[in-house]
């Protein structure tokens, strides 16, 4: 295998041997991987989203499901129930009266769960930032993974946010968050 001096030669030899074995098996049509990599790959390609459309951003969110953008080609399918959803898209102005309902729906989602905050109102209160009845960002109620800016953001911006979420899942994994 490899010639190396030092205390960690066994680990280096194992890595070299694993790489050689993987090359030999790939030629025969096999693949070596870990269970965590397979789970991350499957979760990344089959995210189920739930809408929490509160205002005009929800119209742009609907555009992503239409044939022109077709977000389902990325494995991002809509679900009606929070118990079947991995991702919640908060789109629009979140009021103080609606905040407990948002938290309740978030708590019903299974782990790992992700939140996309869509639009200026969901990100930080937007146009209604100084109103007495508006929550100044949904991140005060639920943890947000991806922020999509704009008033309202375009469907392309939401698609980019979805792709960034998939990239984040690939990078961080899903078993231990």
UniProtKB/Swiss-Prot annotation:
Which biological process annotations from GO are given for this protein?
Answer: aerobic respiration; electron transport coupled proton transport
Q: What is its EC number?
A: 7.1.1.-
Naming one, the record's GO cellular component terms include:
respiratory chain complex I
**Compartments, as annotated in UniProt:** Cell inner membrane
Q: Which residues bind [4Fe-4S] cluster?
A: 56-57, 121, 151
Q: What NCBIfam families does this protein's entry cite?
A: nuoB_fam, PRK06411.1
Please state which protein family the record places this protein in.
Belongs to the complex I 20 kDa subunit family.
Instruction: Spell out the protein name for this chain.
Output: NADH-quinone oxidoreductase subunit B
């Amino acid at each position: 295998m490899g010639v190396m001096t030092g205390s960690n030669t066994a680990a280096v030899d194992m890595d070299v041997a694993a790489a050689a074995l993987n090359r030999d098996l790939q030629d025969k049509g096999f693949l070596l991987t870990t269970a965590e990599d397979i789970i991350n790959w499957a979760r990344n390609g089959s995210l189920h989203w739930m809408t929490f459309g509160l205002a005009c951003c929800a119209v742009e969110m609907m555009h992503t499901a239409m044939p022109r953008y077709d977000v389902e080609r990325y494995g991002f399918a809509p679900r009606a129930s929070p118990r079947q959803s991995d991702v919640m898209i908060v789109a629009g102005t979140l009021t103080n009266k609606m905040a407990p309902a948002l938290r309740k729906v978030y708590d019903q989602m299974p782990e790992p769960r992700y939140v996309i905050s869509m639009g200026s109102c969901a990100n930080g209160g937007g146009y209604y930032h100084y109103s007495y009845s508006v929550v100044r960002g949904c991140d005060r109620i639920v943890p947000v993974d991806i922020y999509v800016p704009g008033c309202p953001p375009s469907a392309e911006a939401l698609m980019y946010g979805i792709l960034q979420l998939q990239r984040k899942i690939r990078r961080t994994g899903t078993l231990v968050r």
